[in-house]
Amino acid sequence: LVAVMLIISSAVFLLSKALLGRSRLGTAPRPKGRSEERVLKGWKGWLTTLVFVGVFLLASLPHLGVILLSSATDWYGSVFPEQVTGAHYREALGHPLVVPSIQNSLLYASGAMIVDLVLGLAIAWVIVRSTIRGRALLDALVMLPLAVPGLVLAFGYLALAQEGRAFSFLVGVNGNPAALLIIAYAVRRLPYVVRAAVAGLQQSNVALEEAALSLGAPPLRMMRRIALPLLSANLLAGGILAFAFAMLEVSDSLILAQQAEHFPITKAIYALLNTLGNGYELASALGVWA
């Protein structure tokens, strides 16, 4: 099933690149005219508002359920909780798993974001600026982590990092999976940074980089003074996405983190869920905090 998903995803991506990736309009000058707002009056305005409110409420239902469950004392057989309390939030933050898990998640997500920014910029540069054969294949391979289920990748990392295997050094002496989790998070979120960097390179004018090189600037100085300032907004957006999704990564966290002192925040939420009595309320409260 995974092989079928990979083949279909790669084929669809390459087809979309072939059909839609030929345009070079990103470097064209921006139009000077300003777009005008169109005010919808009467029933059109009310209908548009109703559609947006309906979509917003539908998308907010899971979040609303978590918030209500985190503050409920007794909720059975009714639409809303009969009583609300803030004790679950205090108890969740006071649990011995919570603060270390937040620190671990910040460490793992920050490391993954740095890896994604470095690799993402390098891969995007090869895809957009180089003339190496196989650039389209590299572009497709980078997007594959979005098509592979997280549990499949997690079990693959777990198998490769077992004692006696080639990548067993990624697990510390005391079983610390920090390096393994950083790599797993980085691979899962690398497509976001690559796509952001590719978009930035396509929109920036290559003539600026060529002018700097022709005037004697070394490649690293050109990158620092010309390319990176032009790509800063794109890299910032990609880095934020990579960090945010890595903070709340579920599949890799549940499989690769097995000791309580190494739990990221998502594994801590799962552990609180299994607490006897008010486990669901505590897990929901920590989910709201997260």
What are these regions (language model features)?
Residues 30-40, 73, 77-86, 91-94, ...:
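Membrane-interfacial helix termini and adjacent extracytoplasmic/periplasmic loops
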Residues 5-7, 12-13, 50-63, 144, ...:
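Transmembrane alpha-helices
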Residues 41-52, 122-157:
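Cytoplasmic-entry segments and transmembrane alpha-helices of multi-pass inner-membrane transporters
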Residues 36-39, 130, 204, 210-231, ...:
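Short helix-to-coil transition segments within interhelical loops
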Residues 12-27, 111-142, 206-208, 219-226:
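Transmembrane-helix boundary motif in ABC transporter permease subunits
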Residues 51-54, 97-109, 147, 156-193, ...:
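Loop-to-helix entry region at the N-terminal start of transmembrane alpha-helices
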Residues 15-54, 133:
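Transmembrane alpha-helical segments of polytopic membrane transport and secretion proteins
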Residues 1-7, 39-44, 70-77, 84-100, ...:
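Interhelical loop and adjacent transmembrane-helix boundary motif
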